[in-house]
Regions:
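Charged, terminal alpha-helix-loop-beta segments
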Residues: 1-194
Length: 194
């Protein structure tokens, strides 16, 4: 199991991906932290069935994420790594083939009126297909190529806990760029000959 240490010398142990939590637990943790992780986006649960008329199938995604400037949006499926790849691909194919309409914009707006402009949502959804992203709790290299055929990102969201139960989250894989006001690398000059 992986471990992490913070700047205060507190150790965190990775929560075993296949251990105690269910998909709903992972989804809840992700939705609680998504706007912190991606501060330029507004996120909310998205439990509206999406229909793929080409295959006559429907599936329901977990989350939606809208960029604050209405320049892009994401349909997100949260998955546990222990789930079958076929199950995941079937859902993503539905989201990929769905025709998004004003009805979807109204659904998002009605779920969280504060912070959204209905006309801007309608314009975004009418002019841009959503980007697709699967957020999974463990690396799934065998999913990545198949998901890419639907232009779907694979984001790994791992949960770590210290000995008091305080959480630390690790994000890896493909995801929207995270704009920060600090450098992601730190180089320290240590000893001779450096």
């Amino acid at each position: 199991m992986a471990k992490a240490i913070d700047k205060n010398n507190v150790w965190y142990q990775e929560v075993a991906p296949r251990s105690f939590y269910k998909e709903e637990d992972l989804e809840r943790v992700i939705i609680q932290n998504l706007e912190i992780i991606f501060p330029h986006f507004k996120a909310l649960p998205f439990k509206k069935k999406l229909f793929d008329s080409a295959r006559n199938k429907s599936n329901t995604p977990d989350l939606v994420m809208i960029k604050a400037d209405y320049s892009e949006w994401y349909i997100i499926e949260v998955e546990l790594g222990k789930h079958d790849k076929k199950h995941v691909l079937e859902q993503i194919e539905t989201f990929y083939n769905c025709s998004y309409t004003d009805d979807h914009a109204s659904y998002i707006f009605n779920k969280r009126r504060r912070g959204f402009n209905l006309n801007s949502l309608k314009t975004l959804i009418a002019t841009q297909s959503p980007k697709l992203m699967v957020i999974v709790n463990e690396p799934k290299d065998d999913w990545k190529e198949d998901l890419k055929s639907f232009r779907c990102m694979t984001c790994i969201f791992q949960i770590y806990q210290d000995f008091e139960g305080k959480a630390l989250y690790r994000l890896n894989g493909e995801h929207p760029y995270i704009y920060t006001n600090f450098c992601h690398c730190k180089y320290e000059k240590v000893g001779y000959p450096f």
